[in-house]
Amino acid sequence: MSGGGGGGGSAPSRFADYFVICGLDTETGLEPDELSALCQYIQASKARDGASPFISSTTEGENFEQTPLRRTFKSKVLARYPENVDWNPFDQDAVGMLCMPKGLAFKTQADPREPQFHAFIITREDGSRTFGFALTFYEEVTSKQICSAMQTLYHMHNAEYDVLHAPLADGGDQSGMEDGEGIPGTKLQRFNSYDISRDTLYVSKCICLITPMSFMKACRSVLQQLHQAVTSPQPPPLPLESYIYNVLYEVPLPPPGRSLKFSGVYGPIICQRPSTNELPLFDFPVKEVFELLGVENVFQLFTCALLEFQILLYSQHYQRLMTVAETITALMFPFQWQHVYVPILPASLLHFLDAPVPYLMGLHSNGLDDRSKLELPQEANLCFVDVDNHFIELPEDLPQFPNKLEFVQEVSEILMAFGVPPEGNLHCSESASKLKRIRASELVSDKKNGNIAGSPLHSYELLKENETIARLQALVKRTGVSLEKLEVREDPSSNKDFKVQCDEEELRIYQLNIQIREVFANRFTQMFADYEVFVIQPSQDKESWLSNREQMQNFDKASFLSDQPEPYLPFLSRFLETQMFASFIDNKIMCHDDDDKDPVLRVFDSRVDKIRLLNVRTPTLRTSMYQKCTTVDEAEKAIELRLAKIDHTAVHPHLLDMKIGQGKYEPGFFPKLQSDVLCTGPASNKWTKRNAPAQWRRKDRQKQHTEHLRLDNDQREKYIQEARNMGSTIRQPKLSNLSPSVIAQTNWKFVEGLLKECRNKTKRMLVEKMGREAVELGHGEVNITGVEENTLIASLCDLLERIWSHGLQVKQGKSALWSHLLHYQENRQRKLTSGSLSTSGILLDSERRKSDASAVMSPLRVSLIQDMRHIQNIGEIKTDVGKARAWVRLSMEKKLLSRHLKQLLSDHELTKKLYKRYAFLRCDDEKEQFLYHLLSFNAVDYFCFTNVFTTILIPYHILIVPSKKLGGSMFTANPWICISGELGETQILQIPRNVLEMTFECQNLGKLTTVQIGHDNSGLYAKWLVEYVMVRNEITGHTYKFPCGRWLGKGMDDGSLERVLVGELLTSLPEVDERPCRTPPLQQSPSVIRRLVTISPNNKPKLNTGQIQESIGEAVNGIVKHFHKPEKERGSLTLLLCGECGLVSALEQAFQHGFKSPRLFKNVFIWDFLEKAQTYYETLEQNDVVPEENWHTRARNFCRFVTAVNNTPRNIGKDGKFQMLVCLGARDHLLHHWIALLADCPITAHMYEDVALIKDHTLVNSLIRVLQTLQEFNITLDTSLVKGIDI
């Protein structure tokens, strides 16, 4: 062991590692706070030479508008004991900053000087933590040089003040104000003045314990009793060194499941540690958080933390910041915060608020500035919590936690049982606590926190000693009323057969803590009771898995979400993408058995196993029914047992082998401790030997020590794993002395982290997208829709906001990206001449004469500014953050995101104006890589704009392409068109005669599915051969092609006057320049030449029975797969039924096979055969020739449906009628009955050859079995397919 070793024992065996003293170093004098270095780097200000050896020469950090007493000065670590321990190297910079986050503070005898306690955490870059507990108090300054230096600063301040405010001297009400308080400067000067001849100067000093575990209450009591010993008029029983030595070297760390009692200066101190099968150690009062914020705000903050938003806590009290942060992270069990975690942000590290990564930080408030004056670098994804004022600002689109209402109700009931109002109590923390301090001031050792030293008295015992209460009791007793039943219960567990060894208030804190934590833990246990089923175990060895971790999918998110109740999805889909969930699953994969498991995971898995045993239903069947927590009593009992039977009492403090005469007691001054006795632990610990028989109950020390080492190794392995796998963001900033190189290195890490996160996100989205495309068959619906895609896109939007917020010169609006876009738009409009950006020609020139028509649409303008205008014209989007996200979604859907951002960043002058040199957007290489990663999104199709903004008005452009052959140009009828999509359909749109291209506007139709086109059969030549129809969304640019290749006209083809066309999306060419593709290839090219359904030996397709069977099987398989997807991810069923390879086409081929050739030029259609079969069966029914009841029912249904289709008012032609009949049969699960019926019909023998498929009973039976698989699905038809029929 180095540095004097810190005594015998290894890392886990000691309660405390260090005792630290921080304060004013009289040798170096007054130095301004570390902010000066930050100013030097960012503002490049020049240093000025000082005027006194006791005033630092670097004074650019000073604010001469503030009086010297209000300024902060640099604090130093004055002493630490021991010097160092191997298992926890002392971090002097971090300890110094966090003990006194704002440096030294000076006060006079006129100022309040109550001691302040706060806890803090030092989180290393690997994620491991050390805990600190600091008590800050004020000592009189005895150094004449320091007093003189303070006097000099006041002279300088007054001179500077007079110069700055002299012109305002006659201004009356405009006299100098200071600090925005509205108090005249002269009055404030007098109030905060310092005169060396009449004032006593005090400076802050801090004593601190550094511990391996967070025993907050015990450490606070130790420090308070030490402080009380210093301020008491009587010296303590023993020198302070004895008590400090005792807590450092002779008080052991309690093992899991054990309790410990040791001695402070004036009284015993008790702490207890949960066992390995309980919730982890947590020693902060949950009650205070709910009182400060209220239940609703706590739940909102909790949700933000789970979704890894940036969280900034804001308070005047360091301990409140720490309590809120620790409570929120403790309630996350079994998940752990994986990002930057600085509950108390030192003033010298304010630049970390610029970090473009998720963080949870606490910012100290001076109590003067309100929220509006607080300039934060980024707010798009920020949750801001003003702890003191019961106020929270939330990010947009925050999903609700599952079962939130029932969850809040359960928590509120617990709070009310403990007398805590669920809505919070704005006044509880100040006025009520002050009253308590006044009432019990003589018994309180720390006036700020209300902790009672020594053997605390219960509040009821205090009341019994009150004379007024005693008189009231006597009066009541004289009236004959018994007070026995009204006695205040002295101990909450008095009905049990044991008594706890702590005061009632402390026990109630323990009880409330564990009850609230159990309820929160129960929620996650219920929500993730079957998570193990969806963990994807790696097939390769551990090393290979670790090296390829970022490319691996370790949790089947889609299947998990498909099992969840619908209300859970918005929250769960985003939570499954967080780093904390990924780390949780990684831990699960890494730990193959209980011996290897992370302790937290072991506890959670044991609770999951217990739920599975208790629940009757199988684990994979989830329910949205709320189930209350049932583990509270068991958890409470474990704590009460530990507090009732103390497992170990540590050695009492004793006299040390000290030099006589040193450490003389002076009331009000913390003495200079003897380092020779405190820096080295006991060599042969006689005190430990003397107490050797007092072993830990139930377990010997060696076994406990082995358990500690194992847990420590598990923890270390976990951190190593996370450091290797989760390096996409900075885990923790290093708290160190600032210098330009350190700040530059930190920002460079931020830039690298952002680039890596961008690479991982794009890869994750592409793998998810293309993985789904690879398993799709038969149709072009290859897109993730619904919750999962929205989650991934929202995550990308958050990343873009963080990138655009990094290194901003001045924040303008909540969305840094939209602010940049607006600046760019303003610059472009200023540079270009008026009207040159107009794109109205596309909409206004909406009609083209038929003679000008060509087979392609006019090109759509591609412009960053035009896409911005589209977003600005959407009235539903109110905020800048919403507009930025909508613009990103639109750009992604148009496959222009990378190009638009490249164009935006091409204005280098604007970028330099908006961003500091270290900003990500000014790092050229990283910026290019970032744009390259975004370019990969062009390989897949997104509908992230169309599927989200479902109610907006969208202009659509239509192009009808008729055949130029066979007199199509002589068409005289009046055509009409109706367009249908996944979100709705248009009314019938009348097309002006001889117009083939037009634009109309309607509510978003979603992805287009069908076009109905027809005419009124008027005029001399009412015959129209339409090749195809094209429809384009003028905002997203998506173009759909609807092939036709058929006549519309009486006496032509099948005599149809209207047709239902099924279309597919055309793909666009990769971006080469701004010209759109004029002849885009099809995603799945439906043939322009329509399948020929007129039965003619010269033109019918030559498919054999095997090919027909295969096409029917693929069509049915496509429908089955459609229904096996989560509902949100299903594509177009219309395409599967009526598309080029759909069910209608496949059955058409089956009925065409072996059809006898017609005589002469007469065309015979399948519908002709069906009508004859209908006539045959109706005749049988009329003649009462019924072979069997089932046959009769099938025949009656068949005839009813054919009649209904024939009676439809629509002029859809014979092929259209066949399509309608097949769709209705599929909907009502009748197709397989009709196939059997038609195969047995005598009409079939007359109209089909002997080799026909429908006459082969084996093939027919096979076809029936295939069609029967559709029976289990509820098929809903597009209204365009069954319009005009009521059956």
From Swiss-Prot:
Expressed in developing brain and developing neurons. InterPro entries: cDENN_dom, dDENN_dom, DEN5A/B, DENN_C, PLAT/LH2_dom, PLAT/LH2_dom_sf, PLAT_RAB6IP1, RUN1_DENND5A. The modification Phosphothreonine is found at T1079. Residues 787-950, 1134-1280 form the RUN domain. This is DENN domain-containing protein 5A. Belongs to the RAB6IP1 family. Guanine nucleotide exchange factor (GEF) which may activate RAB6A and RAB39A and/or RAB39B. Promotes the exchange of GDP to GTP, converting inactive GDP-bound Rab proteins into their active GTP-bound form. Involved in the negative regulation of neurite outgrowth. GO terms for molecular function: guanyl-nucleotide exchange factor activity; small GTPase binding. Interacts with RAB6A bound to GTP. Keywords: Golgi apparatus, Guanine-nucleotide releasing factor, Membrane, Phosphoprotein, Repeat.
